[in-house]
A protein has these predicted regions:
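Short, well-ordered coil/turn elements that cap or connect secondary structure elements
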Residues: 57-59, 87-89
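Short gly/ser/thr-rich secondary-structure transition/capping motifs
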Residues: 40-48
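Conserved alpha/beta-hydrolase "acid-adjacent" motif
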Residues: 71-80
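Alpha-helical elements of Rossmann-like donor-binding domains used by nucleotide-donor carbohydrate transfer enzymes
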Residues: 6, 22, 80, 112, ...
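The feature captures the conserved acid-bearing segment of alpha/beta-hydrolase catalytic domains
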Residues: 48-58
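Catalytic active-site module of serine/aspartate enzymes centered on a nucleophile-bearing elbow/loop
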Residues: 88-127
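Short beta-strand/loop motif that positions the catalytic acidic residue
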Residues: 57-58, 64-66, 70
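Helix-rich cap/lid subdomain of alpha/beta-hydrolase
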Residues: 1-30, 34-41
């Protein structure tokens, strides 16, 4: 399990100290690091479980949402994923939410990320 300082840096760097402590007490769970390493090295080992077929014709619309201050998946990584996925014939979009970190869907500003996601989904579910 991450220490509080690790969690604060990786997930809760864009919120104040009190909220970071609340998030740490509420959300972290111990788990294996194996999936993270598989994802990190997926391009070096294409047979890993994390392999993604970016040209899969059955893939639906995709919206990548990134936090401007995200230390865990910074813009460069999110944008690289977007560039790979946009080769797909289905709609692929990316949006960066300003002044937000990796906790953007669980912290006090979650509504903004939810609005971005909902407006994207509504375009395809309720056209």
């Amino acid at each position: 399990m991450l220490t509080y300082d690790q969690f604060r840096y990786a997930f809760a760097n864009a919120v104040d100290e009190a909220e970071a402590k609340r998030l740490y007490d509420t959300f972290p769970v111990p788990g294996s690091g194996v999936p993270l390493f598989q994802a990190a090295f997926a391009n070096l080992n294409p047979s890993t479980e994390a392999q993604v077929d970016s040209k899969n014709p059955a893939r639906g619309p995709m919206k990548l949402i990134s936090g401007e201050k995200d230390h865990t998946v910074p813009w460069a990584i999110a944008n690289a994923s977007f560039k790979r996925q946009r080769r797909n014939k289905s709609v692929t979009e990316i949006e960066e939410i300003g002044d937000r970190g990796h906790s953007l869907v669980i912290d006090s500003g979650w509504e903004e990320a939810a609005r971005v996601a909902k407006s994207f989904v509504d375009r395809f579910v309720f056209p």
